[in-house]
Amino acid sequence: MADALASQLNNTSLGDANSDAKWKDQLKTPAKDARPQTEDVTATKGLEFEDFYIKRELMMGIFEAGFEKPSPIQEETIPVALTGRDILARAKNGTGKTAAFVIPTLERINPKSTKTQALILVPTRELALQTSHVCKTLGKHLGINVMVTTGGTGLMDDIIRLNDAVHILVGTPGRVLDLASKGVADLSECPTFVMDEADKLLSPEFTPVIEQLLSFHPKDRQVMLFSATFPLIVKSFKDKHMRNPYEINLMDELTLRGITQYYAFVEEKQKVHCLNTLFSKLQINQSIIFCNSTNRVELLAKKITELGYSCFYSHARMLQQHRNRVFHDFRNGVCRNLVCSDLLTRGIDIQAVNVVINFDFPKNAETYLHRIGRSGRFGHLGLAINLINWDDRFNLYKIEQELGTEIQPIPQNIDKKLYVYDSPDTIPRPISNPSQPPQATGMPSGQHIGDRRHNNHPNGGHYQYNRGRGSYRGGRGQGPRRNVQHDQNRYNASQGQHQSGKSQAAPVS
């Protein structure tokens, strides 16, 4: 169907090619991203954004944001979404899903109307901020107003902002329902309803809220669902609330092709030493380190700074303004390392992240998939390293089976071609804050992580001390894979010799 629509639009081509070239020459586009990309985003049908015949003002925003050609999910989604048909789209993390629904949503907005014309729901506050920023960036020439609303911020401020025209409302379900129930957010003439990370939004935690929100929309609404995974509950929602949806499935495999995955077996009490070894050996542009609890996030962030590395942290118990500050600064390259809980597993797009470390191994395949998807964004290369203890060995095997992937034992030396770019300073941040200084995009690859000092923020989320060289070098035992007693990846804090016996759960140390 997407091919037929694109062909039909092609046959109705209007305008002069010379005049088209002139307006494109006047755009202030960022430097071209010269990094190689995988087939996750390059296996396209050869369409251009011009083939969708969207408003010129919208195309100006698209090109000025650094987009060059539509990715496969964008090629499939945009022409169908422009017809107003319901869409159920499944594609990998980091392949351009956000722009796939933002572009047709922006195209269908009437800026002369004061009514809210699109609601975009996301499961986390950070993702809401990012999505609203994408809307504002791509639609900056359209004269529309985009508002983001999430829990943890003042309700009265949102009520005041809704007194003005809001064309697109981006938010988390609970806060949007609160505003709609109070009659402050008028969704009665809102024809577009979008859910990003739909599998999370349709979990038992959110489903009742989602169904209440749908009742505020007109019956002839367009519903679009996007996610990397679709459990059975999504099918139930589709049958109940969607009309003959156009289904897109670009998931021939679950994991991104550009991400290399390794595991290292290490006792709990040796994890920090192992992390120090990884920091000293890897060439990190930016890294995200995941823990399974908020307490461990702060403890680990403190340990990392004691090793001499600059580090931010973020988790759900922090004040929202502090979380926002951490997220903003990390996206703009102020710090190299971020320790966090699963708060940032979904949808967060930070192009400069080339390493993800699971300090605590996740309990299920879905969480693992979303975590490692923070690297290797938009077809680029990335590295995922999992620190595995005795209790994680069965989860490791189960996740490999469910995802149809293989997590390799970590080698003594990791080939830099798998995750390192020659000039990380040139990595573009197409959806970034234009007011940020240009030096925030990264650091030369030859410079050791943490070699620059950063100012502390007055409030939580930022651990930063002076740089100190770590001297620990982890050793490796020898033995068959999956033999926990003699794992070839087992790190030892002293001489690299085997240690037998089950490791005991211990605090970060």
Curated annotation (Swiss-Prot):
One of its GO terms (molecular function) is ATP binding. Residues 7-16, 432-444, 490-503 have a biased composition (Polar residues). Residues 78-248 form the Helicase ATP-binding domain. Keywords: ATP-binding, Cytoplasm, Helicase, Hydrolase, mRNA processing, mRNA transport, Nucleotide-binding, RNA-binding, Translation regulation, Transport. InterPro entries: DEAD/DEAH_box_helicase_dom (IPR011545), Helicase_ATP-bd (IPR014001), Helicase_C-like (IPR001650), P-loop_NTPase (IPR027417), RNA-helicase_DEAD-box_CS (IPR000629), RNA_helicase_DEAD_Q_motif (IPR014014). Residues 19-38 have a biased composition (Basic and acidic residues). It comes from the Eukaryota. A motif (DEAD box) lies at residues 196-199. CDD domains: DEADc_DDX6 (cd17940), SF2_C_DEAD (cd18787). It is found in: Cytoplasm, P-body. It catalyses: ATP + H2O = ADP + phosphate + H(+). A motif (Q motif) lies at residues 47-75. Residues 1-40, 422-509 are annotated as: Disordered. Residues 258-418 form the Helicase C-terminal domain. Its EC number is 3.6.4.13. One of its GO terms (cellular component) is P-body. ATP-dependent RNA helicase involved in mRNA turnover, and more specifically in mRNA decapping. Is involved in G1/S DNA-damage checkpoint recovery, probably through the regulation of the translational status of a subset of mRNAs. May also have a role in translation and mRNA nuclear export. This is ATP-dependent RNA helicase dhh1. It comes from Aspergillus terreus (strain NIH 2624 / FGSC A1156). The gene is dhh1.
